């Protein structure tokens, strides 16, 4: 009887050791698999023509009599707006800023000679979706100078793509797909399989003009995703 009890106890101990070993192995495997991961980046980038442009034309007049100077500035603004309309710009696409008055005498910080007392500067701005037309007119602004209009050195041109928000979902989908493809290739090369997403960064969109052609916009997004791996 005592011998039988010893056999039973030995069997129970053996089975317990086997079960403990299996549990320990599963725990180690789970720990190993949990710790295996890969972090990849996915890119989506496109180039697209701008669909809106804002062109700001700075013009100035100088003189000593402010009322007379204001009259000349009014004439200058009329010439600029007439030039724009003559070349196809619509009335509602044109805006005119009030003139900025620079009192050269009051703002003088030295005894240097100042040939005129006042400088008036104004801006005539064009905001249009006809980007190609505005680009063409920009190339002809020398015609304003030939009319005696003094253009300032602060003319600015700003191109935009207003449909940017509508493109976000498709670009994010492409960036995620590219990240997943990279992760799958990595898993294949390492003899593993792609499991689930651990973390995902939506990524920041950037929109900027090409250096050699500012009217072409580059839209770019990079997403970062970390996947777990399994055997």
Residue ranges and their predicted role:
Residues 2-10, 16-231:
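Short, charged, surface-exposed interaction patches
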């Amino acid at each position: 009887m005592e011998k039988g009890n010893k056999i039973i106890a030995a069997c129970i101990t053996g089975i317990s050791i086997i079960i403990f070993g299996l549990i320990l192995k599963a725990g180690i495997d789970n720990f190993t698999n949990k710790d295996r991961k890969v972090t990849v980046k996915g890119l989506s980038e496109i180039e697209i023509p701008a669909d809106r442009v804002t062109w700001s034309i700075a013009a100035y007049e100088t003189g000593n009599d402010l009322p007379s100077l204001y009259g000349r500035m009014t004439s200058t603004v009329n010439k600029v707006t007439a030039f724009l309309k003559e070349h196809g710009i619509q009335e509602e696409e044109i805006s005119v800023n009030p003139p900025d008055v620079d009192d050269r005498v009051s703002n003088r910080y030295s005894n240097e000679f100042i040939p005129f007392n006042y400088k008036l500067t104004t801006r005539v701005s064009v905001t249009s979706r006809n980007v190609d037309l505005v680009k063409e007119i920009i190339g002809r602004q020398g015609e304003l100078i030939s009319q005696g209009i003094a253009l300032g050195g602060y003319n600015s041109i700003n191109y935009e793509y207003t449909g940017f928000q509508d493109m976000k979902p498709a670009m994010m989908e492409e960036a995620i797909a590219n990240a997943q493809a990279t992760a799958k290739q990595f898993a294949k090369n390492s003899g593993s399989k792609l499991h689930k997403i651990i973390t995902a960064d939506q990524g920041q969109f950037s929109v900027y003009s090409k250096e050699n052609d500012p009217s072409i916009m580059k839209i770019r997004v990079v997403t970062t995703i970390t996947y777990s791996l399994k055997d």
